[in-house]
Amino acid sequence: MTSTIRQHAATRTGFSSVTRTGRTVLTVPARLCFIVEERYENDVMPGAVVDVLRSWGHEVDVLRPNGTVADLWDLLFTGSTRYDAFVLKTVSEGPGLTLLDAAGAAGITTVNDYRSIRLARDKAVAAVRARAAGIPFPKTWFASRTALLDQIPADMYPLVIKPNNGSSLKDVYRVDNPEELAQLDIDDSTRMLAQPYLVNPGYDMKLYNTGDEVFATIKRSPLHPGADVVEEQIPVTPELRALALAVGRAFALDIYGIDVVETPDGYVVLDVNDFPSFGMVPQAAERLARTVLRVTRRNAIAAATTTTVDSTLVPVLEATA
């Protein structure tokens, strides 16, 4: 195993549950690998989840893809540590996503499902997935180069412009006319999205699903930086809960967040995040740790009772009221 993974092999005390077919169901305690890129090393998430899992007696290693060459055969097939699941916290197109895809291709559980993460992270694909599922989502244009955005008709302004692979609300702009669009200083090689600006109260709502419950918060909007906004947790109405669960089903995500705005025509989803910060969510680390273990156990049992690989993307959301 690579040197950047914190190993605990010398103190392994777990055992494996084995079915009558001889296939391993799940090691107890669970053996997990978190893939965490440099940007998130000092963030609360996912470090707090790692700490909780370790405090419960599970064995958790942390792989930093920016600091090592990963021996894929050792990591996924022949190494002394056989992981029950991999958990990803990376930037949109970081190298960690390739490692998670590799784990999924090897038949190992990933949280979230590696195919679901791809659906959510490509914002153009996410927009289409949401629209196809009947989820309210803004009309979306995709441009392979920034310069192509000037082909959007002038009567569609104002527009919201953002990178197709953006994260953390960076480089999100409102432009009221083609002249303002031309003034944006954006690398022309950047793949961009454009969506009509939707009238809203001046703040965003963030819905979080920890896998067992939905939470709602009010967050500042990058389009209204001067607005007087109190960021706080708010009650989850039945409508908001239904919207959050619909997104989970459409993308087959277990843990996720969505950005929502309230418009004159109702709530509209703006973005889907496969592993957000879960800010202001009570006991977030404990809730997420339980979901990681539940998904790992569920998938291990399912794998032990089937003889074929099911490549169909299916909903895995288990949120309850």
Feature-to-residue mapping (PLM):
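Extreme N-terminal starter segment of soluble prokaryotic enzymes
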Residues: 28-33
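Conserved N-proximal alpha/beta basic substrate-recognition cap immediately N-terminal to
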Residues: 38-139
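Short glycine-rich anion-binding loops that position phosphate/pyrophosphate groups of nucleotides
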Residues: 91-93, 165-166, 275
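Short N-terminal or domain-adjacent regulatory/targeting segments
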Residues: 1-26
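Phosphate-binding site of ATP-dependent enzymes
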Residues: 170-251
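Protein kinase-like catalytic core scaffold
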Residues: 159, 193, 215-216, 256, ...
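A long amphipathic alpha-helix within ATP-dependent nucleotide-binding catalytic cores
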Residues: 224-269, 273, 281-305, 309-319
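Rossmann-like NAD(P)H-binding beta-loop-alpha module
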Residues: 138-157
